[in-house]
């Protein structure tokens, strides 16, 4: 357990795992380090843990493949977890909220990013006394139409999904996808 400092941790202050290890050793616990990109962009998300490079982990449900993938990964992480969002819509935020609610213990979460949107596809999750009550947010058809992407962008996303889906659903890839 960490004593309260000016800030809780420095999130992903270095690009590579060797740099994180060096900084972690230099700081000798004076400032806790957290992995984010080293987890969600890695082919082996536990490598940063095995290297002893961090004191905490920031996880985002959507980039990891959803709440189940996040919870599976969490079983192998001996550090405090911060469940955060990847600038998700209120609908996308459902995944992070579900994962955070399912964890036996979770540190403070970074799930209040819905306020960064000027408009969302549904009513955003609202903080109540510093907490986000869990509810399933469903898209509003009128807002979906209003926010619809141009046809060429829609096509780009469809092609990306077709390209990435086989990678994400391959049995050897149970934690993360390179897409």
Task: Name each region found by the language model.
Residues 3-98, 120-121, 126-127:
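Catalytic core of soluble alpha/beta enzymes
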Residues 86-179:
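Flexible C-terminal active-site loop/helix
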């Amino acid at each position: 357990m960490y004593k309260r400092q000016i800030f809780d941790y420095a999130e992903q202050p270095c690009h590579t795992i060797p740099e994180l290890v060096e900084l972690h050793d230099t700081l000798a616990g004076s400032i806790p380090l957290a992995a984010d990109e080293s987890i969600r962009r890695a082919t082996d998300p536990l490598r940063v843990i095995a290297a002893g490079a961090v004191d905490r982990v920031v996880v985002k449900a959507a980039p990891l493949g959803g709440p189940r993938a996040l919870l599976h990964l969490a079983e192998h992480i001996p550090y405090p977890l911060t469940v955060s969002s990847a600038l998700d819509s209120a609908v996308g935020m459902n995944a992070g909220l579900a994962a955070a609610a399912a964890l036996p213990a979770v540190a403070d979460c970074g799930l209040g990013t819905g306020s960064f949107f000027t408009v969302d596809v549904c009513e955003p999750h609202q903080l109540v006394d510093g907490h986000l009550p869990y509810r399933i947010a469903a898209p509003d058809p009128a807002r979906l139409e209003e926010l619809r992407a141009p046809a060429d962008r829609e096509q780009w996303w469809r092609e990306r999904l077709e390209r990435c889906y086989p990678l994400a659903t391959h049995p050897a890839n149970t934690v993360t996808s390179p897409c």
